[in-house]
């Protein structure tokens, strides 16, 4: 068994918005807490994929950028100085004979008395553009993540994809880039009706139904793409400075079953106290499932304190499940 100094009361797997709020709440409860995340920075998909997008269903915020929400959550958590392990993926979860939970990762081994999964839809990878030699331009002119819209200022940009995210990026870049095109392989988009209506009224050039069939280049420099009709032979050369691929993301959750967790429909089944079938292990946010579950960030914010309180009650049966209100725990914004 690891030395006592290496054992945490609570380890949160996942540093997205719900994981960050769980960490804040664990700080209020004075739990020795660690966050482990596979990404290079906290925030999950909100940071990696949509930092410039507005979120409209966070209580108290008529609209807030995803990146700003994450910055606020990090600031809220900061006073507790939790340990954070980034670019570290959990590869195995096991319960030791004494009940201690062992987490093997790509960088080492961690020990914790309780664990909360807050991994959203799991560790994710973008669906890449399936064209030969595309890797030569990825990260330069071909992008799967957009973290700063300003770099597209005055440029000719195309977004490939037919869902809400692709439409959102096209509309947001409309007032930034010189020209914006959106490419979809079907005649109709899969986005919400209101978003599609906004797109049709915008100056964004709609290229449907087309697929990207080739990359155009000159002296090994990206100059655009060739489009081919989905059902036909007509081709179209589209000069571009940048191409954003929004074909969605793949994630694998098969390892959760291998670890013994009760999983169905790509989610961990939990009880009303957010506990799983493994003692001391809890799940919150989009990764957890129960009857009537609604997948919203706001829902996860409610689940996080429930999981933390019950995890600490599991750890210390004399601990209160219903703690005192936060207003009595802070003075001038600083924990007492």
Swiss-Prot record:
Cofactor(s), names only, from the UniProt record: FAD
First-tier enzyme category under EC: oxidoreductase
Keyword field: FAD, Flavoprotein, NADP, Oxidoreductase
Protein name (Swiss-Prot/TrEMBL): Ferredoxin--NADP reductase
Subunit structure, interactors included: Homodimer.
Family: Belongs to the ferredoxin--NADP reductase type 2 family.
Record-linked Pfam families: Pyr_redox_2
Cofactor, how bound (note): Binds 1 FAD per subunit.
InterPro entries tied to this protein: FAD/NAD-bd_sf, FAD/NAD-binding_dom, Fd--NADP_Rdtase_type_2, Ferredoxin-NADP_redctase_2
Binding site for FAD: 37, 45, 50, 90, 124, 286, 327
EC number: 1.18.1.2
This protein's record includes keyword Oxidoreductase: yes
GO MF term set: ferredoxin-NADP+ reductase activity; flavin adenine dinucleotide binding; NADP binding
Keyword Oxidoreductase on entry: yes
Substrates-to-products reaction catalysed: 2 reduced [2Fe-2S]-[ferredoxin] + NADP(+) + H(+) = 2 oxidized [2Fe-2S]-[ferredoxin] + NADPH
